[in-house]
Amino acid sequence: MPVRIERQGYVTTVVLSRPGARNAVDGPTAAELADAFRRFESDAEARVAVLWGEGGTFCAGADLKSVGTGRGNRVAEDGDGPMGPTRMRLSKPVIAAVAGHAVAGGLELALWCDLRVAEEDAVFGVFCRRWGVPLIDGGTVRLPRLIGTSRAMDMILTGRPVPAREAYEMGLANRLVPTGRARAEAERLAARLADFPQACLRADRASVLDQESLDEVSALRGELRRGWGVLAEGLQGAARFAAGAGRHGSFADE
């Protein structure tokens, strides 16, 4: 199976497994990826997801060998994106565990995620530049929002490889981890997020996503509206702090 779902506690790991194709995504694989994240979204027990590419490569993009074979990626204005879940807006966070290359459509999958944990020898890039294949899974939208227009233009126009250290320094990668540790460290981070009060975490995440399309006044109102909705959870947390929990920067209740 090119896509499988694994669960540990509140953390769901979606595994992309086409190592013989460097985890390039064809049409059926894109559909399976989208379905996997729909299952995650609808699972009340699942709080955070990790997307990981098996075999040492995150994803080499769309499988160009599938074009014209009946297994090509679906390209239409409606429905799922060509790479699968890239048009979805989930209510829960997703972390990309990046080993090896996250390039072309694979970069766009990583950009769709909320956070990116990258191994020290990982490489990001718009490698589809050399083939004349456009970014149509959110790359021209999410990349400049994430790292700024100037840096995004550099990556998009040149198609150059961006090593993990540079990606981290520009804010494209959120964590750098040793080679071979991306999945484990992403799942560890996911477990930490899953331990937080979830209504508040999801409300703040939604406010961050919404503010990109709103003026400041509207964004502030939206933030307050969501905050009111989960304030009871915050009051419980304040009571625990007053009782001595979580002092000195600790996330533990003791």
Task: Describe every region a protein language model picked out.
Residues 21, 31, 53-90, 102, ...:
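Glycine- (often His-adjacent) and acidic-residue-rich active-site loop
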Residues 14, 51, 63, 109-111, ...:
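Hydrophobic/aromatic residues within transmembrane alpha-helices
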